[in-house]
């Protein structure tokens, strides 16, 4: 799950990580009130969307007067903003964050993430902050420091200090960085996060470190034990179809192709998309109906797939282990009748009660195209959209 900057900073503050004072606003007048409550300025006004790169899209403004604050907020609120990190999707700006604007002397980069390669929580730090870390890694990799944390020992203070010295920080800043890193480690583990990014982690004119911008992602699989994080979810920033899918316990991801996919099991779903690509097609979605698929869930899955007008065919690929093929067949028949599917439906069934399932489809009177295996199904789906 993704979070807004202001939500990330709330969590940072709870764990003692220095952040500039700030308030959120949903109108230009509220933004002015927020600015006045923070002092005499200057201020930063920042659009709150689930994407980085807001500055280049006009979503971050430096303001010296409350009139400028009002103008900046009015320009952002109620609009949709696309950045180079939003994958071409324009996200609604419903809130702005108004913060104190400190005098920056140096910008650093610091992040915490799960490194699957080393199977560890890993820190990435750089003396080049305020820019994309990917560019730094490509152009000046010597300016990046990495630290893989031993799972048993956890992060030790000396490791944070070592990073600080390599970044060229002064003694006071080295100790501050070490404390920030330890706090981030605790936050990361306490909340089951998958990413924390401070960019920039700035040195202000008083010599202190502050997290001027922050990004966090949490592990969706752990949301059930973090109701306080679930309450922060902003569905307006998410794909409407994916939100509906999650509400129905379906794992759905929108893609750019024209062949809808309905599969049980994430691994088989990914393999299905691969085989479609291998045969020259483009999947329109990833959709895992799960091992406990019911007729109702299959019907909902069809509705989700057909919510996109790009879908020209649907490939249903089911391996009946836990789920029975005859039950899936009943669900497919009911869904096709209820939804009124107008595009070709290709079905491959294998596993428990497969013969009964195929018989139900064959005698349904519906124009359902049977497939012998995954490759045959993919070929027929590709052929259906290229007619």
From Swiss-Prot:
Q: What chemistry does it catalyse, as a reaction equation?
A: succinate + ATP + CoA = succinyl-CoA + ADP + phosphate; GTP + succinate + CoA = succinyl-CoA + GDP + phosphate
Molecular function per GO: ATP binding; magnesium ion binding; succinate-CoA ligase (ADP-forming) activity; succinate-CoA ligase (GDP-forming) activity
Q: What is the lineage of its organism?
A: Bacteria, Pseudomonadati, Pseudomonadota, Gammaproteobacteria, Lysobacterales
UniProt cross-references to PROSITE patterns, sorted A to Z: ATP_GRASP, SUCCINYL_COA_LIG_3
Q: How cofactor binds (record note)?
A: Binds 1 Mg(2+) ion per subunit.
**ATP-grasp domain segment(s):** 9-244
Which Gene3D superfamilies does the entry mention?
A: ATP-grasp fold, A domain, ATP-grasp fold, B domain, Succinyl-CoA synthetase domains
Please give the GO cellular component terms listed in this UniProt entry: succinate-CoA ligase complex
Q: Record's family?
A: Belongs to the succinate/malate CoA ligase beta subunit family.
| Keyword Repeat part of the UniProt annotation | no
The molecule here is called Succinate--CoA ligase [ADP-forming] subunit beta
Q: Which organism is it from?
A: Xylella fastidiosa (strain Temecula1 / ATCC 700964)
The entry describes its oligomerization and partners as:
Heterotetramer of two alpha and two beta subunits.
